[in-house]
């Protein structure tokens, strides 16, 4: 939006040409999202608290969590508002990548909102039935996949990139559609499973978004992409602005979500953020890198799958409780220790993911 204004003003004032630089707009996206979070966050938290939109706690969970009951949730709405406003202000609104990732993020946020609203406002303990939740996730995920497949303007947009190896690419053809579907839906649910402790999911999300922003910038630059051996995707660079908005919104939310949390994001935030990461990863053709950088999300998801499978086959549980962060709590780890150690692991994994740019 402001880029359109800058394009007009540059005809009269040369200084406005600086807004063509992605790095500047990415930084402004971060700062704008942060400022909005700090301004809107406190009144939104008070509003959620005044309407008793508070978190419910599992009786069979760690006893330390009982004190969290009633903490305002659905704070993911703050994240979505800040991402949307910042992205619309600083991105090129003629870029289909920007609209694709933003609309999918909001669509998954809508699914999460309905689930949270049913549980917290209508007091329906089951929320949105699982079959309907996965149905709508599938509808939006498949819709995004078909849109990207049919609007792809070059073979590079639908290739599967194998990191650590030079020039190892697979032309996916129509298999690109199920790939995008599984990455977006899987990433959405993985982040949702991770969102069980104060700040546990949001900082890894911020770190992964920052890492993907670097891939987006390199992919959108012909010289960098050729030098690094990654596909050249002219439209991908604009995703730097979206990722910047996500980073700023995430850091702004963490200000209120850090231990002890003043607000939780709820499904409205977790489902949306996971879908956003999945969309950016498929748009810059780095699905495997997403699994590396988002290894915390993968670990949490696998722990749930193993727990369910083991219990169904043997009647025994592998972990004291799943997802695995609860296992460590029940082993006696204080919640802040679990959170910070998972954060440290996430930093390491993001660095490994970034290393794939050169280790080929």
Swiss-Prot record:
User: Do the record's keywords include Kinase?
Assistant: no
- Check the record and name the CDD domains matching this protein: GT_MraY (cd06852)
Give the enzyme's EC designation.
2.7.8.13
Q: Name one GO cellular component term.
A: plasma membrane
Could you name the domain of life of the organism this protein comes from? Bacteria
Query: Ribosomal protein: is it a keyword of this entry?
Result: no
Keyword terms: Cell cycle, Cell division, Cell inner membrane, Cell membrane, Cell shape, Cell wall biogenesis/degradation, Magnesium, Membrane, Metal-binding, Peptidoglycan synthesis, Transferase, Transmembrane, Transmembrane helix
Broad EC category: transferase
Q: Which GO terms describe its biological process?
A: cell division; cell wall organization; peptidoglycan biosynthetic process; regulation of cell shape
Pathway assigned in UniProt: Cell wall biogenesis; peptidoglycan biosynthesis
Swiss-Prot/TrEMBL catalytic activity: UDP-N-acetyl-alpha-D-muramoyl-L-alanyl-gamma-D-glutamyl-meso-2,6-diaminopimeloyl-D-alanyl-D-alanine + di-trans,octa-cis-undecaprenyl phosphate = di-trans,octa-cis-undecaprenyl diphospho-N-acetyl-alpha-D-muramoyl-L-alanyl-D-glutamyl-meso-2,6-diaminopimeloyl-D-alanyl-D-alanine + UMP
Chief location: membrane
What is the membrane topology here? Answer: Multi-pass membrane protein
* The protein's required cofactors: Mg(2+)
SS bond partners: none
Record-annotated membrane-spanning stretches: 21-41, 70-90, 97-117, 134-154, 168-188, 199-219, 236-256, 263-283, 288-308, 338-358
Q: Which GO terms describe its molecular function?
A: metal ion binding; phospho-N-acetylmuramoyl-pentapeptide-transferase activity; UDP-N-acetylmuramoyl-L-alanyl-D-glutamyl-meso-2,6-diaminopimelyl-D-alanyl-D-alanine:undecaprenyl-phosphate transferase activity
Question: Per the record, a Pfam family?
Answer: Glycos_transf_4
Q: Which family does it belong to?
A: Belongs to the glycosyltransferase 4 family. MraY subfamily.
Name the NCBIfam families for this protein: mraY
**Stated name of the protein:** Phospho-N-acetylmuramoyl-pentapeptide-transferase
Species whose genome carries this gene: Methylococcus capsulatus (strain ATCC 33009 / NCIMB 11132 / Bath)
**Which lineage do the record's taxonomy fields give for this organism?**
Bacteria, Pseudomonadati, Pseudomonadota, Gammaproteobacteria, Methylococcales
Instruction: State the encoding gene.
Output: mraY
């Amino acid at each position: 939006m402001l880029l359109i204004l800058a394009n007009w003003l540059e005809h009269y004032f040369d200084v406005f040409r600086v807004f063509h630089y992605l790095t500047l707009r990415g930084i402004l996206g971060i700062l704008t999202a942060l400022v909005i979070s700090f301004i809107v966050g406190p009144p939104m938290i008070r509003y959620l608290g005044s309407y008793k939109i508070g978190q419910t706690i599992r009786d069979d969970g760690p006893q330390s969590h009982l004190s969290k009951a009633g903490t305002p949730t659905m704070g993911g709405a703050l994240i979505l508002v800040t991402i949307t406003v910042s992205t619309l202000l600083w991105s090129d609104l003629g870029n289909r990548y920007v609209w694709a990732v933003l609309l999918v993020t909001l669509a998954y946020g809508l699914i999460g909102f309905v689930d949270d609203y049913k549980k917290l406002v209508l007091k329906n303990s089951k929320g949105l039935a699982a079959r309907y939740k996965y149905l709508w996730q599938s509808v939006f995920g498949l819709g995004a996949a078909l849109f990207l497949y049919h609007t792809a303007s070059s073979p590079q947009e639908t290739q599967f990139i194998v990191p650590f190896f030079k020039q190892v690419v697979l032309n996916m053809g129509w298999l690109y559609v199920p790939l995008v579907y599984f990455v977006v839906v899987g990433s959405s649910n993985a982040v949702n499973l991770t969102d069980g402790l104060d700040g546990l999911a949001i900082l890894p999300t911020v770190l992964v978004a920052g890492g993907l922003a670097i891939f987006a910038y390199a992919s959108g630059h012909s010289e960098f992409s050729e030098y690094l051996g990654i596909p050249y995707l002219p439209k991908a660079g604009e995703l730097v602005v979206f990722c910047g908005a996500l980073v700023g919104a995430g850091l702004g939310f963490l200000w209120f979500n850090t231990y002890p949390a003043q607000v939780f994001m709820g499904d409205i935030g977790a489902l949306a953020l996971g879908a956003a990461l999945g969309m950016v990863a498929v748009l810059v053709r780095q699905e495997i890198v997403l699994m590396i950088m988002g290894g915390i999300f993968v670990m949490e998801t696998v722990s749930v799958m193993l727990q369910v499978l083991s219990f169904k086959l043997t009647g025994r549980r592998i972990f004291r409780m799943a997802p695995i962060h609860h296992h460590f709590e029940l082993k006696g780890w204080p919640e802040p220790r679990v959170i910070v150690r998972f954060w440290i692991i996430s930093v390491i994994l993001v660095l490994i993911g970034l290393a794939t740019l050169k280790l080929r």
